[in-house]
Amino acid sequence: IEFVKRYNNLEFNDAIRQLASEYGIEMEENRGYGEDLEIYYNINRDAALFFYKAFTEKANKGYSYMKRRGIRPEILKKFGIGYADESWNSLYEHLTQKGYPVDKLIEVGLVSESKGRYYDKFRNRVIFPIINTAGKVIGFGGRAIDPSDNPKYLNSPESKVFRKKNNLYGLNLSRASVGKEGFIILVEGYMDTISLYQGGITNVVASLGTALTENQSHLIKRYTKDVVLSYDSDSAGVAAALRGMEILHNDGLKVRIIKISGG
């Protein structure tokens, strides 16, 4: 269990579930923690499906934006890219109709409340589901489509199933390639990851922002000890690369740096 937990970056209960699933063992959940986690995973899964359908079933600003960025349909599907429309509460209505309690929707950061009214946290944004190595949707990133909307990127808050410092975007897709290539390419963001993946460079992950953490370094070390840092070439990216290099070196990893333009 400990090996599965560490190798797949899972909580104890999730490691047990994964082993049970692989070996065809039926589990009877203890009341409390296990059930609580499962509802978060289910909420995120259904939200991801809702966003994906909005992105794929009819013309929308999100799909047009990604098309302008040159991302091919098969890559969009691979990463489960979605679209949060401009409605104030379409996701809220969808999920509450499925019977999910509002307090859980607020906890995972999909819904906010103001003066007794509930509204969607992500609106008019391209949605990037964050998926762990067990295939569970644990959070989301949302990229503003309108240049006047701030912040440019909106991410899920910390929750019982999402700890930003413990996860790497795209690792669910890239870990086999990392093992094959013998090294990992670490970039800043969602679009960096997707663009490189589309170009055939599939041993790539993102640190979910500019600040690499020690836990993320430990996670990388489970798969390889050779890291190529490819952060943006602006001042923030350079500073982050230097901080990241120090963290990785202190963890016993070999680090190379290459510069990319963009953001």
Which residue ranges define each predicted feature?
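Short beta->alpha linker loops
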Residues: 7, 83-86, 191, 211-212, ...
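C-terminal or mid-to-C-terminal helical accessory/interaction module adjacent to the motor/catalytic core
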Residues: 252-263
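Short phosphate-binding/catalytic loops that engage adenosine nucleotides
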Residues: 71, 100, 201, 252-253
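Phosphate-handling DNA/RNA-contact segment within nucleic-acid enzymes
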Residues: 33-35, 39, 44-46, 87-227, ...
